[in-house]
């Protein structure tokens, strides 16, 4: 999966925000935090599909612990994008 397509969806960006803030969450924890902090009331099945897309893009990694599957943020692909197109804070960059 393409990283750009993975981050194009606002729900997936919210999932990444939550995992960047607190990695190692289960699906249940993620769904609760998405509802409370972002007002996202998607089903567990829908969030699972979003997590699958993010994992395929290399933006998250998972590990099973007992019956739970835990999710971690993996920033490597985003770091590669930032390194490819660095953002300058120099005001002259924006002048024409």
Where are the regions that the model predicts?
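Short capping segments at the starts of secondary-structure elements
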Residues: 10, 22-26
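Short, hydrophobic-biased segments on the C-terminal half of alpha helices
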Residues: 51-52
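Beta-hairpin "wing" of winged helix-turn-helix
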Residues: 55-66, 72
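Amphipathic alpha-helical dimerization/coiled-coil segments
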Residues: 17-21, 74-96
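Short alpha-helical segments that sit at the start of domains
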Residues: 1-18
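Short acidic, hydrophobic short linear motifs in intrinsically disordered regions
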Residues: 25-33
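Short, positively charged loop/turn segments that connect secondary-structure elements
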Residues: 35-47
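Hydrophobic small-molecule pocket/channel-lining residues, especially in calycin-type beta-barrels
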Residues: 31, 39-41, 58
């Amino acid at each position: 999966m393409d990283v750009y397509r993975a981050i194009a969806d606002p729900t997936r960006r919210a999932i990444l925000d939550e995992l960047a803030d607190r990695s190692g969450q289960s699906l249940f924890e993620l769904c609760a935090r998405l509802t409370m902090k972002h007002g996202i009331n998607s089903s567990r099945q829908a969030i699972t599909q979003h997590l699958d897309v993010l994992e395929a893009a290399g933006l998250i990694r998972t590990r099973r612990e007992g019956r739970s599957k835990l999710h971690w943020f993996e920033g490597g692909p985003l770091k590669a994008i930032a390194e490819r197109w660095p953002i300058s804070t120099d005001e002259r960059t924006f002048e024409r």
